[in-house]
Amino acid sequence: MNKKLNRRIFIEKSAMAAAAAGILSASACSTNDKKDLAGLFIHHVYFWLKDPSNQEARTRFEKAARELVTIETIIDSHIGVPAPTSRDVIDTTYTYSILSTYKNKEDQDIYQTHPKHLKFIEDCQDLWDKVLVYDSVSI
């Protein structure tokens, strides 16, 4: 009987410990890990390639874009293509977008005249029909 009682107590304590660990784990996962973009300068560029079905052109653009976002003043970057979403307010006509964030306008100004940025334009401008830029700062 003593063995059964000890086993039962062990199981109950183990269950409580597991439940407590689960609660702690769940609360740790629910913390807000969102990156705060407040105060940053956001530069978002959309490109429409002349021939988006040309794989050689796409490869050339992607390689150049990956080099472009290595500029030192860029805090974070994202090179993307239209997401597979369909709503009336979404424009999916562009071929690529490049999003980059900067500490301030001065760092973005450095980017604008940086040799890697100028090389990107020189090497790829023959690939696109249209470029549209949206810059924004926090409210």
Segments (PLM) and residue ranges:
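Short, glycine- and small/hydrophobic-rich beta-strand elements in well-ordered beta-sheets
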Residues: 28-33, 66-95, 132-138
